[in-house]
Amino acid sequence: MSWFTPEVIDVIIQVVKAIVVLLAVVVCGALLSFVERRLLGWWQDRYGPNRVGPFGMFQIAADMLKMFFKEDWNPPFVDKMIFTLAPVVAMSALLIGFSIIPITPGWGVADLNIGLLFFFAMAGLSVYAVLFAGWSSNNKYALLGSLRASAQTVSYEVFLGLALMGVVVQVGSFNMRDIVEYQAQNLWFIIPQFFGFCTFFIAGVAVTHRHPFDQPEAEQELADGYHIEYAGMKWGMFFVGEYIGIILISALLVTLFFGGWHGPFGILPQVPFLWFALKTAFFIMLFILLRASIPRPRYDQVMDFSWKFCLPLTLINLLVTAAIVLYNTPAVAAQ
């Protein structure tokens, strides 16, 4: 009797696909470091990395070698177990969160009926990594940075969820593939859910702690925040995890508001991966452009903006969407 039944072969294929997708995300997260520096140099009219290899293309390899050979040192005053666990949780939570993204009709790690809820579970888990890092470091700057980061992340995750509820109400499902297919038959949600998109994008930048919402890592105030005691590969996991977060939020924007793997007006349906990659790359570059062009506000301004602007906007968007859906739903005759 052969072990390789059709069911076993299907499981093996799905596992291989999952490994390929997640490894590709990690590699892209590492490469984004080089892409960001090149784009910042171009936009700010200066040289980017241009010494290692042609056009500085091997700079990322040099950075990785430097990181691998740095001493993996634990300060004597830290809580070693939690100190080591924090970067692992930070990177793995975001990487697992990417598993719900449908890249093409046939490629994706997991097709969950509660896909969006699973994403929020992983996003909430990443908050613990920041708290672990700040508390276990026994450093006042690290603790202040982690408190800032956790308060900011928890606040903006509220609006992240409320911004998506308009999409869920219209589709009637938390499944990511259902949302993509709904947009293929109707308008992309960037039009009917424009205010939800704006709020989701702002909250996504804040949750990933990217400029201008990088107050938890403000060098001038907190000396790099909760990262301050980390070095070597532990710091590298935080570093790559941040870029994985950028890729994840960009992929979610594409999936939820820009039709996923579908092209505009049904153009070139034969290349779904190309459309998904191009749209995701656009939002990644938009993240980088924000760093190059917008100053950092004060921390109290960031929190005021969340509760005084984002909350009313998301609630109004959700109420209007619910009213429209209710109006367009045919009344059920009383039995």
Swiss-Prot record:
Gene Ontology CC annotations of this record: plasma membrane
A Pfam family that the UniProt record links to this protein: NADHdh
EC number: 7.1.1.-
This protein's UniProt keywords: Cell inner membrane, Cell membrane, Membrane, NAD, Quinone, Translocase, Transmembrane, Transmembrane helix, Ubiquinone
Main location group: membrane
UniProt keyword Membrane present: yes
Keyword NAD: yes
Function per UniProt: NDH-1 shuttles electrons from NADH, via FMN and iron-sulfur (Fe-S) centers, to quinones in the respiratory chain. The immediate electron acceptor for the enzyme in this species is believed to be ubiquinone. Couples the redox reaction to proton translocation (for every two electrons transferred, four hydrogen ions are translocated across the cytoplasmic membrane), and thus conserves the redox energy in a proton gradient. This subunit may bind ubiquinone.
Family to which this protein belongs: Belongs to the complex I subunit 1 family.
Official protein name in the record: NADH-quinone oxidoreductase subunit H
Organism name: Pseudomonas putida (strain GB-1)
